[in-house]
């Protein structure tokens, strides 16, 4: 292990002790935002420090075994212990190198998930609903919370657009590579000739801002309109202008929210989504600049590019960024995304390691 890695790991060990002291303070929960930030930081560095301690213990085990090897009757045992400890040392060292790769500061954040129907008409809207169910089922497996913020149903039962908030540890880290174009090839239920149709949806995964103040929202640059929410009617028919539309004039970003029962709740949710979209736009611009200097397959978050094809007749899903094809479409559409997410993360880490070596 080189000196810079050792220095960084020692620094993290000291910081963990400091965080433990701060989080054990009786007054820490007075500022909940600060408490969340410190808790998130501790959750991020504690596993790294634990791994470093295991690495140091392996070094100590080698030293102890070498001393034992001086005694003839202990030499065979000591040699086996040295081999085992050296294997652990190599394994821990490689893992620590990965752990010290540049961290995405958004990895532990909650997310806003947006799915929009694209080409393909009704079939695209139905696929948007299928994608939402896939992500909702994945969230359920992770014990995350899913809250629909806004939805625009289609006439056939799908969604022209749906926005949801997914809350849970590491939500962004696991789903951040889902942004982009998703193409589906299948025979629609309305197709009488058995022909395969191709349609597409666009997915955007955006990290939630800790506070709306994280994004500079000048009230003078916002146009806020209220209108009557559309719905099924009945006893809960909306007789007031509770739906809210917010337009960010400098960027032209528009957010509508009408799923909440009150104008106050709809406005608060719309502001949260707006802050996330503006922040996401800034991130995309930054990533585009980075992509211009080096090729990145999975880390750009390009919304316009087709990232994945779902071919139902063949039972396969292909991720075009890493040339991965899995013949388990039913399991994946039911929320079994772990293999896909892990493969994309591994490719991203390989790119980071290659960039560090340049």
From Swiss-Prot:
SMART domains per record: PCRF
Cytoplasm as UniProt keyword: yes
UniProt xrefs under Pfam families: PCRF, RF-1
One GO cellular component, as annotated: cytoplasm
Predominant localisation class: cytoplasm
UniProt GO molecular function: translation release factor activity, codon specific
Keywords: Cytoplasm, Methylation, Protein biosynthesis
Localization, UniProt: Cytoplasm
Protein modification: Methylated by PrmC. Methylation increases the termination efficiency of RF1.
Its biological purpose: Peptide chain release factor 1 directs the termination of translation in response to the peptide chain termination codons UAG and UAA.
InterPro entries, per the entry: PCRF, Pep_chain_release_fac_I, Pep_chain_release_fac_I_sf, Prokaryotic/Mito_RF, RF-1
Keyword field contains Translocase: no
Source organism of the structure: Nitrosospira multiformis (strain ATCC 25196 / NCIMB 11849 / C 71)
Descriptive protein name: Peptide chain release factor 1
N5-methylglutamine: residues carrying this PTM: 235
Homology family: Belongs to the prokaryotic/mitochondrial release factor family.
